[in-house]
Amino acid sequence: MNTMTTYSGRKFDPMQMTPGDVYIEDIAHALSLLCRGGGQLTYFYSVGQHSLNCATEAKARGWSERQQLACLLHDASEGYISDIIRPVKIYLSNYLEIESKIMGTILTHFGLDDLTEEESCRWKQIDDEILEPVSYTHLRAHETSLHL
């Protein structure tokens, strides 16, 4: 058995994760330290902050608390297995399977394992909409007069 130790001190095998292994403190801590976009931003922007922004946007749109929670948790698996940028992730089918399995366990823990296809598409919509401005604004936000 290959175990990981979480921020809270719990030990478990992420390949055999159960809903009882899920602790929001572990997810929140890890996501707060994980930079979006592989760190290729003008300033540090955590996956945790992005998740909060997605949930806040869902609330602003008048979506249900269930949908807000789904938005908050949409990257929660990355709290256990980190993040890989989208252009690379699509080529890693084994990683995608592991990520999906862990995400399913997390959703079960929070009572969201029965999300409809429409509900899943809604959080993906916000994720994409919030991702785009970060990609374009933060990646290109600085101009430098330094020429080497």
What are these regions (language model features)?
Residues 63-136:
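Divalent metal-dependent catalytic cores for phosphoryl transfer on phosphate-bearing substrates
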Residues 8-22:
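N- or domain-start disorder-to-order transition segments that initiate the globular core
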Residues 39-66:
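Alpha-helical phosphate/pyrophosphate-handling elements in metalloenzyme active cores
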Residues 137-144:
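Conserved small/polar residues in nucleotide/adenosyl-binding loops
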Residues 25-46:
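Active-site flanking loop/helix segments enriched in acidic
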Residues 26, 30, 53-60, 105-109:
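Residue-level signal for well-ordered alpha-helical scaffold segments within enzymatic catalytic domains
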